[in-house]
């Protein structure tokens, strides 16, 4: 190859390389500009229109790094649209309940710093479940735990942990409260926290970590609420609150709350005579609650809440196998669906039930006289037929030789249906166990299952002789 040919060849190769590089730079430039503009757009699932991402959301976005030769481009991915929960799916069909969680708080207190608590409950946001309880402002192995049998002191706070995590020293204290309820509307948590003087208490409404509203006592006699989860449908949360006598006529009101703000208050109506400590669940398009009549009945009151027009109705669970404690034996107990049965109505315990067509699932203490043992079963016709007593699918949760306590319901939304779950408070210490000076609890949690299941007993399990005094 002569010198001229060499020059021509080298020139051709150089020109080709330059052209390729030029085209690559154009491609990089086009890609950069395209990604720059697309990072501020997201597709709305509602109408397929392009919506601008709000700048305030960018801090929560996921950042993807895209590498093009030596150029680094950050692409912002628009987050999913956060929506209110509507609970419109059907209730899951179940055959019974399967074990889900147990926190073993009392056993762990023998060798660790665990809060003294009572009135526990469970509630879930769209992605995770949490356990709550009212702390006594002290750990168990602490002299402040003496005489913690008392319900209402200014040091009590609402505690919140992931389900299954005992209330250790690092636990978050959500608010000041000796009575409470919590629920998640799909966007943020609402906490209803009651504290203050018995004759002039205050309920604070905390939404998304901020105090939004409050209400004072309306009957000057221990304003109190559910001690389990409230329910939110399409952004409206309902909570049942009572103020007045615990063994006589009281003033029960249902509060409707939107993002922490009270938007309406409805008085209790219907045939229920006394209502407190309600266990509520979504029954689209409304909310249904099973409560405690501490005055006249050992059959449990039912409160139906219409979220759209704020109307209220109430009656009693029809099952002749009644759910409260104390109660008459099953042969002589009764319920006519409309009125309290006037059988050992004075005193009681928080509990739960839920309808399943014409039937009812329910839980109760095994003992008819004390908070000992715990059982669940289904009563055929127990939702619609007065004094129905045909029991099936009975399960022992805590054997009759061990203590139980309050119990309540919470709901979990699955892919195709809404499951019902419950917790049982396992009380230990005073008054029954006088070797120690404290009163506290652990919990056990079960959820509905469509599968098969075995048998067992899941008591607290702590040896009181090994516990701090």
Curated annotation (Swiss-Prot):
Glycans are attached at residues 61, 70, 86, 146, 200, 234, 402. Disulfide bonds join 92-417, 124-129, 183-230, 232-237, 278-291, 280-289, 318-337, 421-447. Inhibited by the neuraminidase inhibitors zanamivir (Relenza) and oseltamivir (Tamiflu). These drugs interfere with the release of progeny virus from infected cells and are effective against all influenza strains. Resistance to neuraminidase inhibitors is quite rare. Substrate binds at residues 118, 152, 276-277, 292, 371. The active site is at 151 (proton donor/acceptor), 406 (nucleophile). It is a single-pass type II membrane protein. Residues 331-343 have a biased composition (Low complexity). Residues 11-33 are annotated as: Involved in apical transport and lipid raft association. It comes from the Viruses. It is found in: Virion membrane; Host apical cell membrane. It catalyses: Hydrolysis of alpha-(2->3)-, alpha-(2->6)-, alpha-(2->8)- glycosidic linkages of terminal sialic acid residues in oligosaccharides, glycoproteins, glycolipids, colominic acid and synthetic substrates. Residues 326-350 are annotated as: Disordered. Residues 1-9 are intravirion. GO terms for biological process: carbohydrate metabolic process; viral budding from plasma membrane. Ca(2+) binds at residues 293, 297, 324. Residues 36-88 are annotated as: Hypervariable stalk region. Residues 91-469 are annotated as: Head of neuraminidase. One of its GO terms (molecular function) is metal ion binding. Gene3D superfamilies: 2.120.10.10. N-glycosylated. Catalyzes the removal of terminal sialic acid residues from viral and cellular glycoconjugates. Cleaves off the terminal sialic acids on the glycosylated HA during virus budding to facilitate virus release. Additionally helps virus spread through the circulation by further removing sialic acids from the cell surface. These cleavages prevent self-aggregation and ensure the efficient spread of the progeny virus from cell to cell. Otherwise, infection would be limited to one round of replication. The influenza A genome consist of 8 RNA segments. Genetic variation of hemagglutinin and/or neuraminidase genes results in the emergence of new influenza strains. The mechanism of variation can be the result of point mutations or the result of genetic reassortment between segments of two different strains. Belongs to the glycosyl hydrolase 34 family. Homotetramer. This is Neuraminidase. It comes from Influenza A virus (strain A/Memphis/1/1971 H3N2).
